[in-house]
């Protein structure tokens, strides 16, 4: 099982990029769910604008689907500058990055998604560009090779990552502003669902939006994906209004429960409860019981379950929590 295949994955699917761009907020005033980030960025952006300077380099990190790309475009819009976007895996050679940097204009934004996946050779080029707005380029080969320095316009690098801990210290230390995006609360997600429903010209009740938001795992990308599937259901079933009943029927059909769990989440938790009597159970045994790779369990399934308090990792293995027993209606062994 691959994370991208799951309906409740925060990772963007290939066909979602165009739709996500259309419903993405353009300015901080419309940016929901990250009040501290919003407040701080408003100050930093206004200060840079008043001084007519490039904003300090910005690192945005957090789980997938929370709006890192959205925030980077908002920053560019608020500063009224151009934004060029790329990603770590695409920048294979120093020349790839040099081509982008030399095409930037004064105070422009360069956005690098998955910045933790930059190759070491590209990262080395980035250091003087970030610090001194200079590009060191090697001309020629062998004994005749020489280094020349190119001056770059002042620019803002925005790096986005789901794995801030994987960044090298020299790269991380060069970001003047660091923002962590948190999972969204129910109210914020409900407003996002209603806003997207308006974009799709859907007749949706607030209760219907709440039902979708509740099952969206605190993630706007998942909320918008579930909204599109609920829209399909309502259209085929000829429902005039997407209320909580229609949303429940659609999401139950999709096997997304009221905690946002899908089949694989429930399979893992039920294995711990039923097969291993609540745990503790080792990772090898758990992987064998549910027929999944250990890496998939650790990297894809467990993080959200642990964060929501349904699973605990202990030195002796995984154990189910009180919330898990309540959710599945099991009595906890004494």
Swiss-Prot record:
It is found in: Cytoplasm. Transmembrane segments: none annotated. GO terms for molecular function: ATP binding; ATP hydrolysis activity; four-way junction DNA binding; four-way junction helicase activity. It comes from the Bacteria. Residues 185-255 are annotated as: Small ATPAse domain (RuvB-S). Mg(2+) binds at residue 69. ATP binds at residues 23-24, 65, 68-70, 131-133, 174, 184, 221. Gene3D superfamilies: 1.10.8.60, P-loop containing nucleotide triphosphate hydrolases, Winged helix-like DNA-binding domain superfamily/Winged helix DNA-binding domain. One of its GO terms (biological process) is DNA repair. CDD domains: AAA. Keywords: ATP-binding, Cytoplasm, DNA damage, DNA recombination, DNA repair, DNA-binding, Hydrolase, Nucleotide-binding. It catalyses: ATP + H2O = ADP + phosphate + H(+). Residues 4-184 are annotated as: Large ATPase domain (RuvB-L). Its EC number is 3.6.4.-. DNA binds at residues 313, 318. GO terms for cellular component: cytoplasm; Holliday junction resolvase complex. Homohexamer. Forms an RuvA(8)-RuvB(12)-Holliday junction (HJ) complex. HJ DNA is sandwiched between 2 RuvA tetramers; dsDNA enters through RuvA and exits via RuvB. An RuvB hexamer assembles on each DNA strand where it exits the tetramer. Each RuvB hexamer is contacted by two RuvA subunits (via domain III) on 2 adjacent RuvB subunits; this complex drives branch migration. In the full resolvosome a probable DNA-RuvA(4)-RuvB(12)-RuvC(2) complex forms which resolves the HJ. Belongs to the RuvB family. The RuvA-RuvB-RuvC complex processes Holliday junction (HJ) DNA during genetic recombination and DNA repair, while the RuvA-RuvB complex plays an important role in the rescue of blocked DNA replication forks via replication fork reversal (RFR). RuvA specifically binds to HJ cruciform DNA, conferring on it an open structure. The RuvB hexamer acts as an ATP-dependent pump, pulling dsDNA into and through the RuvAB complex. RuvB forms 2 homohexamers on either side of HJ DNA bound by 1 or 2 RuvA tetramers; 4 subunits per hexamer contact DNA at a time. This is Holliday junction branch migration complex subunit RuvB. It comes from Psychromonas ingrahamii (strain DSM 17664 / CCUG 51855 / 37). The lineage of its organism: Bacteria, Pseudomonadati, Pseudomonadota, Gammaproteobacteria, Alteromonadales. The gene is ruvB.
